[in-house]
Amino acid sequence: HSQDTFTNEYNKYLEAKHAQEFVQWLIKSKRRGGLT
């Protein structure tokens, strides 16, 4: 099932991308002093 493998890899990629964006957002929030 090559389709399953592709979906799996794609999901992993999306998760990594989402995690990266979340980290970036956290850093921005901390810089603004929104997180105390």
UniProtKB/Swiss-Prot annotation:
<keyword id="KW-0372">Hormone</keyword>
<keyword id="KW-0964">Secreted</keyword>
<comment type="function">
    <text>Glucagon plays a key role in glucose metabolism and homeostasis. Regulates blood glucose by increasing gluconeogenesis and decreasing glycolysis.</text>
</comment>
<dbReference type="GO" id="GO:0005576">
    <property type="term" value="C:extracellular region"/>
</dbReference>
<dbReference type="InterPro" id="IPR000532">
    <property type="entry name" value="Glucagon_GIP_secretin_VIP"/>
</dbReference>
<dbReference type="Pfam" id="PF00123">
    <property type="entry name" value="Hormone_2"/>
</dbReference>
<dbReference type="InterPro" id="IPR015550">
    <property type="entry name" value="Glucagon"/>
</dbReference>
<dbReference type="GO" id="GO:0005179">
    <property type="term" value="F:hormone activity"/>
</dbReference>
<comment type="similarity">
    <text>Belongs to the glucagon family.</text>
</comment>
<protein>
    <recommendedName>
        <fullName>Glucagon-2</fullName>
    </recommendedName>
</protein>
